[in-house]
C-alpha cells in the first residue's frame, strides 16, 4: 500500500473500531457514601495536596448484619427462619379497641348525660352540669369556649367589643 492509501485506511479503520459498542460488565461498588470530607484550599493550577485521610463515611452495605441476624449470631438473637403465617396471625389491627372506646355509639366523656356519677366525679369538673348545659360534653365545651373567649379578649377590645 502506498502512503496516501494508508492515510485514508487507518482513520477509517479507527472510526469503524471506535463505533463498535464494547459492553464490559458493570460492577457495583461497595456502597460506601462519603458524608463529609475536609477539602483543603489550593491554588487552581496546582495539584491538590493530600486528600483527607479520615473522611466521614457511611457504609450502606448491610449484608454482614443481615447475615448475622439470619444466622442468629447478632446479640444473642435466634432468628434463623422466615416469618410464617402464624407470625402474622398474632398481629392485630386495633379493631378490638373500638368496642372499648365507643360505648353506646358515643365517645366517653361526650355523652349528654353521664352514665356513672362515680366515674364523672373521678374525672373532675368535666361531668358536672352547668345550668341547662348537660353532662360531660357540655362541661368540656364550656371550658373550651371560655378559654377561647379569654384568649380572644384582647382582639375584642381592639375591635371595640364587637
From Swiss-Prot:
Origin organism is Pseudomonas aeruginosa (strain ATCC 15692 / DSM 22644 / CIP 104116 / JCM 14847 / LMG 12228 / 1C / PRS 101 / PAO1)
Could you tell me what this protein does?
Answer: An intrinsically disordered chaperone for fibril amyloid FapC that guards against fibrillation within the periplasm. Upon overexpression of the endogenous six-gene locus (fapA-fapF), cells form large clumps during liquid growth, make large amounts of biofilm and produce amyloid fibrils.
Q: Where does this protein chiefly localize?
A: periplasm
Phenotype upon knockout is:
Both a single fapA deletion and deletion of the entire fapA-fapF six-gene locus show no visible growth phenotype and no change in biofilm formation.
The gene from which this protein is expressed is fapA
Query: Family, per the entry?
Result: Belongs to the FapA family.
What switches on expression, per the entry, is described as:
Constitutively transcribed with a peak during mid-exponential phase; maximum transcripts are seen under 37 degrees Celsius and at 200-500 mM NaCl. The first gene in the probable fapA-fapF operon.
Record's keyword terms, sorted: Chaperone, Periplasm, Signal
Record keyword Chaperone present: yes
User: An example of a Gene Ontology BP annotation on this entry?
Assistant: amyloid fibril formation
Record's protein name = Functional amyloid chaperone FapA
